């Protein structure tokens, strides 16, 4: 068997950050908020990692892309 035995454990359900905090609009100028949802390499983190709902993931993606276009966020980050 590849991978070894499976461990039984219940994972805690991830809660959407925006729903929990009552945020209805994601502003592309709020770079500190957007940086929470970007990997150290500059990629947008997926929903399964962050727990963001589909509605807010779409808004988040649009805001990050706008911030990148306006040079508020980098497209990629250096290795060093």
UniProtKB/Swiss-Prot annotation:
User: Keyword annotations for this protein?
Assistant: Ribonucleoprotein, Ribosomal protein, RNA-binding, rRNA-binding
- PROSITE patterns recorded for this chain? RIBOSOMAL_S18
Gene Ontology biological process terms, A to Z: translation
One matching Pfam family: Ribosomal_S18
Q: Which GO terms describe its molecular function?
A: small ribosomal subunit rRNA binding; structural constituent of ribosome
Gene3D superfamilies for this protein: Ribosomal protein S18
Q: Which HAMAP family match?
A: Ribosomal_bS18 (MF_00270)
What is the annotated quaternary arrangement, including any partners? Part of the 30S ribosomal subunit. Forms a tight heterodimer with protein bS6.
Biological function = Binds as a heterodimer with protein bS6 to the central domain of the 16S rRNA, where it helps stabilize the platform of the 30S subunit.
Question: What protein name does the entry list?
Answer: Small ribosomal subunit protein bS18
Please tell me the species this chain comes from: Staphylococcus haemolyticus (strain JCSC1435)
- Give the encoding gene's name: rpsR
């Amino acid at each position: 068997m590849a991978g070894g035995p499976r461990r039984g454990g219940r994972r805690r359900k991830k809660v959407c950050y925006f729903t929990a905090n009552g945020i209805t609009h994601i502003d592309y100028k709020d770079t500190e908020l957007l940086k929470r949802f970007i990997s150290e390499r500059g990629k947008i983190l997926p929903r399964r990692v962050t727990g963001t709902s589909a509605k807010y993931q779409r808004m988040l993606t649009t805001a990050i892309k706008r911030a990148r276009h306006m040079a508020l966020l980098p497209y990629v980050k250096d290795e060093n």
